[in-house]
Design a protein with these regions (language model features):
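RNA-interacting cores
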Residues: 1-198
Length: 198
């Protein structure tokens, strides 16, 4: 099973800063198979945080989905949709992109079910061991996210010293819980530096 990213152009004047669950709900309403697709992931959106608790997306912002190739092709039907999120998120054209096997990968927010950093690292290491992946990692900034079940807490995480096969494997499977709300999705990182400054 080949896993890829789908990148969509987006336009949106403003979003709530804690948008993860709301974005998933909006996408699940537009893609009727997303809720049942266990391996699907939704990348965090990148923008500029404002003092009033909102997030502004620039022209280069992209909505990114991590999906199997089959689902990726079906997801392209999102183009032209307007999602009920913030001031309204307009989805433009989408492109399918292969995952790149960098030796160092980074996730903005990994959730292993605990807020204590030492326990977080222990659980992350155990999950990596179980998947046959190396446990070379550096934790960074603490994060929190609201969901209907309560607040999720976790940390950014960098994995390094990966072989090409290991890099693609961890990008395809993710780490921890909450891939559909932006957690545990790894992307290439060019060097082992300043993971806490993401």
């Amino acid at each position: 099973m080949t896993v890829v990213d789908v990148s969509f152009e987006v336009r949106c004047e403003r979003l709530p800063r804690d948008y993860g669950y709301a974005l998933y709900e909006a996408l699940a309403g537009a893609l009727d198979w997303l809720e049942d697709e266990a391996s699907a992931g939704v990348h965090p959106l990148h923008g500029t945080a404002a003092a009033d608790g909102e997030l502004f997306l620039g022209r280069r912002a992209r909505l990114m989905l991590r999906l199997t190739e089959e689902r990726a092709e079906r997801s392209l039907a999102l183009a032209g949709a307007r999602l009920a999120l913030g001031s309204g998120l307009e989805v433009g054209a989408g492109k399918v992109r292969a995952l790149m096997p960098y030796a160092t990968v980074h996730s903005h927010f990994v959730n292993t079910g605990c807020a204590d950093e030492a326990e977080f690292l222990a659980r992350a290491a155990a999950e990596l061991r179980e998947a046959g992946l190396p446990e070379r990692m550096i934790s960074g900034k603490a994060h929190a996210m609201s969901t209907p079940e309560g607040e999720l807490r976790g940390f950014s995480l960098l994995l390094h010293g990966l072989s090409p096969a290991q890099s693609l494997a961890v990008q395809a499977r993710g780490l921890g819980q909450g891939r559909k709300i932006g957690c545990g999705i790894f992307v290439p990182h060019k060097s082992v530096v300043a993971v806490g400054a993401d």
